[in-house]
Amino acid sequence: MRLFLSLPVLVVVLAMVLEGPAPTQAAPEISSTLGRIPEKLKEFGNTLEDKARAAVESIKQSDIPAKTRNWFSETFNKVKEQLKTAFS
């Protein structure tokens, strides 16, 4: 799962970093740009991790999983009863 998420993230970050400065900005040296890549990747990873954890916690605390489970149980029981009456 981590590899599945990390590869697209790495591609996006590298594209953003290697895109270059805007025309109004001074051109930084390549070595300083390449030296900042690891810290930018770490910062981006930490931000992404925090947002993912917050989303998971929000889902855990909501009643959506319980409602979904109840709906599937009720639907399954209805189908089971209909099959019982149809084949008996």
UniProtKB/Swiss-Prot annotation:
Entry superkingdom: Eukaryota
Family: Belongs to the apolipoprotein C1 family.
GO cellular component, one term: high-density lipoprotein particle
Originating gene: APOC1
Subcellular location: Secreted
GO terms of molecular function: fatty acid binding; phospholipase inhibitor activity
Protein name in the entry: Apolipoprotein C-I
Species name: Mirounga angustirostris (Northern elephant seal)
UniProt keyword Signal, yes or no: yes
Keywords noted in UniProt: Lipid transport, Secreted, Signal, Transport, VLDL
Keyword Transport on entry: yes
